[in-house]
């Protein structure tokens, strides 16, 4: 297919919807929360009336990128015209959660363990190598905090959840918007009421979840993540996840709302998070069979929970006496008792256990052959593509949490010492990123509301995220699985994140991040070869960054030069700025911004 045209579209329809929304929801931010809904359009030159049918009045200009379905080849060569654009039907392309590819694998997967819901990345030759387009009528997302309750319907144009979950107040259609009332399967009257009840249950009616010591939560099968959204006023950070399954596009809704979430499933492999990272694991009708397979999934929860952490279970076995629910409940009681958990509350459709810090109990139960204790070798490596373990460990990090999040952000996590990172290096990193983040905001020159979903693609010890903590945004701290395992230290700072290998695409929908930060990421991967090339990682960055989103790149001079040359071919604008590194040496930092384009 041939080249196309650039046409500048009118924002008038978006402005009309903006006015309607302001009338509906009251005194929000008078337009600044809606962004600029004026994309450039790519159309086929064969369309004889492309100029007249366009919403633009400014006329066409040349646009070199071609619309053509292109696959990854052994030798990567980007055309002079720029990276090809995928056809419109691929606007929700998620390489490692591709239903068509997974269907080919079904005969070899353990369906009883729901292995089909996990990551399955196709071989290179079956991966697309073209820019993923936005859907028809895509608009710059509504800004936080309005986005918690309202998002553009055209950005996630799927009605299934509204049809099957409307009675539970997950999401409702309101004209050209989706409205999220804050409900869920077990809290259809609203998450705030449910969260207060959990606080009462964990504190014996004396406080809330925060006073119960809950600061970091893992929400299993999170739906549209309203639970996480309404934990935010308490200052509680939640890692929400759900599979790409029959609950159509639930994670896409969550991310469009500006809530931390990722596609994942608890099935046959460990979750991509370190041991002892969460104060609470929450399951509200999460569709996980915890009682099956000798409770191996419950043992994964045990791995993830900190000592004295809570497991919240809101599901029929906790309260119903019909069908096989009592049998399931008995199995859960036996499993949790074997792991030395204590049932502290059971009422109003919810049961809560606490993982007691009782090594003597675990060793006694191991002697009674009620449980198996993991060997040291089982807990020593990053949780990336590691099979689930049918055992429990007793060597989780028991570092005492500082009294406040501010203290945690600046306190040296002792786990970093085991990774060869000194307290002086920690302090240097923390102070450096405070300075850099201030300069980043000046150089980006955007309203703080324009950046909500942020990813640090090579987070090291979380200094960048710690420096960003005072802004109205969240950061997904990614620690590459092939690098020093510092993610447990990041969690000890009160931050969150995940392991990942950038030789593969990330488990998220297209257009989900406003800012990607890459500090010497490309340098690390330049020795890994096919699938990990600079061009591969740039393509994945383009897939997951939102239109008008920023990509900040710091790296070796040769890599910075290469990215600067390639950026226009990915339809990125690029600026270079001279900043100082940690050791006061000047380095070139690239500020790339993805153009807002669409297929006409």
Curated annotation (Swiss-Prot):
Pfam families: Methyltransf_29. The chain crosses the membrane at residues 16-36. Its main location: Golgi. InterPro entries: Put_SAM_MeTrfase (IPR004159), SAM-dependent_MTases_sf (IPR029063). One of its GO terms (molecular function) is methyltransferase activity. It is a single-pass type II membrane protein. GO terms for biological process: methylation. It is found in: Golgi apparatus membrane. One of its GO terms (cellular component) is Golgi membrane. Residues 37-600 are lumenal. Keywords: Glycoprotein, Golgi apparatus, Membrane, Methyltransferase, Signal-anchor, Transferase, Transmembrane, Transmembrane helix. Disulfide bonds: none annotated. The keyword tRNA processing does not apply. Its EC number is 2.1.1.-. Signal peptide: none annotated. Residues 1-15 are cytoplasmic. Glycans are attached at residues 49, 98, 110, 157, 200, 204, 334, 447, 484. Belongs to the methyltransferase superfamily. This is Probable methyltransferase PMT7.
């Amino acid at each position: 297919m041939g080249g196309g045209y650039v046409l500048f579209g009118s924002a008038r329809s978006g402005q009309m919807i903006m006015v309607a929304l302001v009338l509906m929801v009251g005194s929000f931010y008078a337009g600044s929360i809606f962004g600029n809904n004026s994309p450039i359009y790519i159309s086929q030159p064969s369309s004889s009336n492309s100029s007249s049918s366009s919403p633009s009045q400014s006329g066409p200009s040349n646009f070199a990128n071609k619309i053509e379905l292109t696959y990854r080849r052994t030798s990567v060569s980007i055309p002079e015209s720029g990276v090809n654009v995928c056809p419109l039907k691929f606007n929700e392309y998620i390489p490692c959660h591709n239903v068509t590819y997974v269907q080919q694998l079904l005969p070899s997967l353990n369906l009883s363990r729901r292995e089909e819901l996990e990551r399955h990345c196709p071989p290179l030759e079956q991966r697309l190598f073209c820019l993923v387009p936005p859907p028809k009528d895509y608009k710059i997302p509504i800004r936080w905090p309005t986005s918690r309750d309202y998002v553009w319907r055209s950005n996630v144009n799927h009605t299934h959840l509204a049809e099957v979950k409307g009675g539970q107040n997950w999401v409702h259609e309101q004209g050209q918007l989706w409205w999220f009332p804050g409900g869920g399967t077990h809290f259809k009257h609203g998450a705030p009421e449910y969260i207060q009840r959990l606080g009462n249950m964990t504190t014996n009616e004396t406080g809330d979840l925060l006073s119960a010591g809950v600061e970091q939560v893992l929400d299993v099968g999170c739906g549209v993540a309203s639970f996480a959204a309404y934990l935010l006023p308490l200052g509680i950070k939640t890692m929400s996840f759900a599979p790409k399954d029959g609950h159509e596009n639930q994670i896409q809704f969550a991310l469009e709302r500006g809530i931390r979430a990722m596609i994942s499933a608890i099935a046959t492999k460990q979750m991509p998070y370190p041991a002892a990272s969460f104060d609470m694991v929450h399951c509200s009708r999460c569709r996980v069979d915890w009682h099956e397979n000798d409770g191996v999934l419950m043992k994964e929860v045990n791995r993830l929970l900190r000592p004295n952490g809570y497991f919240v279970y809101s599901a029929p076995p906790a309260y119903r006496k019909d069908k096989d629910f009592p049998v399931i409940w008995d199995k859960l009681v036996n499993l949790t008792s074997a792991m030395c958990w204590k049932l502290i509350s059971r009422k109003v459709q919810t049961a809560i256990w606490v993982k007691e810090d009782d090594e003597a109990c675990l060793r006694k139960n191991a002697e009674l052959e009620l449980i198996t204790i993991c060997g040291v070798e089982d807990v020593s490596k990053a949780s990336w593509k590691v099979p689930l373990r049918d055992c429990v460990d007793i060597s989780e990090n028991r570092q005492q949490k500082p009294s406040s999040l501010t203290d945690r952000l600046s306190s040296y996590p002792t786990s970093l010492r085991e990774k060869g990172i000194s307290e002086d290096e920690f302090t240097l990193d923390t102070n450096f990123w405070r300075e850099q983040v201030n300069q980043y905001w000046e150089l980006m020159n955007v309203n703080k509301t324009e950046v909500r979903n942020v990813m640090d693609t090579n987070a090291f010890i979380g200094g960048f995220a710690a420096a960003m903590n005072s802004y109205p945004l969240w950061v997904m701290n990614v620690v590459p699985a092939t690098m020093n395992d510092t993610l447990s230290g990041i969690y000890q700072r009160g931050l969150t994140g995940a392991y990942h290998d950038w030789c593969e695409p990330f488990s998220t929908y297209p257009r989900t991040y406003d800012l990607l930060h890459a500090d010497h990421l490309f340098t690390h991967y330049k020795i890994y070869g096919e699938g990990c090339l600079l061009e591969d990682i740039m393509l994945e960055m383009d897939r997951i960054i939102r239109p008008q989103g920023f990509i900040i790149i710091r790296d070796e001079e040769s890599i910075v030069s290469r990215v600067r040359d390639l950026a226009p071919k990915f339809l990125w604008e690029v600026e270079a700025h001279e900043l100082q590194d940690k050791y006061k040496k000047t380095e070139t930092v690239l500020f790339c911004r993805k153009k807002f384009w669409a297929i006409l």
